[in-house]
């Protein structure tokens, strides 16, 4: 008994049991698992970051596609409204030309309208319509004045008159001219041009415009078209739902937005004030939501994608497993 105890105390190795072999196998597998896990963790993080960046890029592409579709709808709607406005203006102009009395637009008209009922001065009265073939009083007066004007023969040099009568009896031939007739003849001589001016100043009555805009009754279609799509842009990407200026000056930035200084003022000058304000507000709401206030589409896409990624250029490295367990760590737990 004592000999066996001494043999054990002298360091004689005992034979391996099945339990000890199983434990050694378990610790060896755990070591391999730890090595594999620590080596693959940085790669997994890099892969997850790349997947997240790709997902952001896909979402951004979907958003830009939605904006392009909305912008297309806005452009199509504006073109339809432009066509409808042109058709309406043409119909109003045709009705105005057909309703204009003969000789009203003549530059040398000698006929002035009577002070009776007409479509500019008073409401239409059906009772004053003359029968076919019947000459009205105003027409008879007009014909009489014309005959009287044709019968007057004035000398080469107009002599002095006293109350409309020639003072010198030796002057040939004596002709009595009434001051009232002369005044009336002058009004007939210049009545046509005055009436034309009256018609031009009263375009607002026919077209529903203010007096200042009456000269621009026939608006050009180019004044309603959208701004230039291919202008140079120096603006940086900003929010998609607001503009500092009106949307017509900084609107279509898909290929570059023109500056507000380069915008022509002819369209805004010829538009009616209420209509111009409505177009500005409506365009600001639609164009700002559709395109935002960005610069060029390519630069905005590149900047957004680069800012969203922010990935390292090299795959990150990990610490060695020896720094965690030591250089001489024995996973087999053998002595």
Swiss-Prot record:
The keyword Phosphoprotein is annotated on this UniProt entry:
yes
Q: Where is this region: Disordered?
A: 152-179, 252-271
Domain of life, source organism: Eukaryota
Q: Which GO terms describe its cellular component?
A: cytosol; nucleus
Kindly list the positions at which Phosphoserine occurs in this protein: 257, 260
Keyword check for RNA-binding, yes or no. Answer: no
Q: Which residues form a coiled coil?
A: none
Per UniProt, the ranges with Polar residues bias are 257-271
Alphabetized UniProt keyword annotations: Phosphoprotein
Disulphide connectivity of cysteines: none
Official protein name in the record = Uncharacterized protein C4F11.03c
